[in-house]
Amino acid sequence: MFKKISNYFNKKKLKDKKYSFLFDKHLKNEYVCFDCETTGLDPQIDDIISIGAVIIKDNTIVSSKKFVRYIKPKNCSLDEKSIKIHHIRECDLKNGCEIEDVILEFLEFIGNRTLVGYFLDFDKNMINKYLKPLLGITLPNRSIEVSEIYHDFKIELIPQSFVDLKFKTIVNDLDIPEFGNHDSYNDSIMTAMIFLKLKNHPNVKIK
């Protein structure tokens, strides 16, 4: 109920009715897993430098449909610490896209599908940082956090246990193949695999 009310007021702020499809009822059994690489961990001051996303339809990752964009930082420069994490240098972004163009392309890609991610709130906050000034809204899509599903799954098996929610731990525990970490597209693929592994487990219920 709260989500419906929130989306009602969110939609009223939409500056361009072309994007009203975002508020349509979510497509059943279709999801978008996405990940952002950024200049840092503060949505207030840091910028997105890459977005990677994949579509899941039913129980299949649709490999023919992917979203990968590199973006020129708007306000921040890359520091040594962040380069060590994602291995993206300023020279790699010299021909990057403008963030406003990428945000609009991203909206077309995700449509009204449910969003899936690992620590998804951070990535959504980064997207919303640019989306709100651009279109007046925040992402209205239904969202699923894989670390929450994994946590509930492990607690069900061993009540009151400590659950390590590090991405690498989850990947290894679920026997997900490891690709290069801190690459937005690779991370979105691995997150999609985590989601499908959990979704299809008999003891897991996706709310």
Regions picked out by a protein language model, each given a short descriptive name:
Residues N128, A192-K199:
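Short, amphipathic alpha-helical segments that act as regulatory/interfacial helices
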Residues I144-S161:
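Short alpha-helix plus adjacent loop in nuclease-associated cores
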Residues T38-G40, E148, M190:
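Short, glycine/acidic-enriched loop or turn micro-motifs at the edges of active sites
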Residues P202-K207:
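The feature marks non-catalytic terminal segments
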Residues K4-N128, P133, I137-N141, D164-H182:
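Conserved non-catalytic scaffold segment of RNase H-like nuclease domains
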Residues D183-I194:
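Acidic, divalent-metal-coordinating active-site segment for phosphoryl/phosphodiester hydrolysis
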